[in-house]
Amino acid sequence: MSSTSAASAAGQGALPAYDTPLGITNPPIDELLERTSSKYALVIYSAKRARQINDYYNQLGDGILEYVGPLVEPGLQEKPLSIALREIHADLLEHTEGE
């Protein structure tokens, strides 16, 4: 008897096979696309912001503070791209197409 049929037999119903991954699925891509003119603009927008966040972390040891750090509370070991996508989703950034 498989584990799925065993769970059904026990009356528990179907259980998810895995946890929902974080990152690109949170915030949802459809909601992010509402904030830009195209998926390509979203890629460029988020990549530029992720690079700024990465440069911010790299310069902390030098004491220069030329770049702006994360505008949302970063999670433990959260990647700069995930932080940038959360900032875009929260409308914390201003973006002009073509820049």
Swiss-Prot record:
Keywords, in A-Z order: DNA-directed RNA polymerase, Nucleotidyltransferase, Transcription, Transferase
Function of the protein: Promotes RNA polymerase assembly. Latches the N- and C-terminal regions of the beta' subunit thereby facilitating its interaction with the beta and alpha subunits.
Gene transcribed to yield this protein: rpoZ
Keyword Transferase applies: yes
Entry similarity comment: Belongs to the RNA polymerase subunit omega family.
Protein name: DNA-directed RNA polymerase subunit omega
Record GO biological process: DNA-templated transcription
Region (Disordered): 1-20
Subunit structure and binding partners: The RNAP catalytic core consists of 2 alpha, 1 beta, 1 beta' and 1 omega subunit. When a sigma factor is associated with the core the holoenzyme is formed, which can initiate transcription.
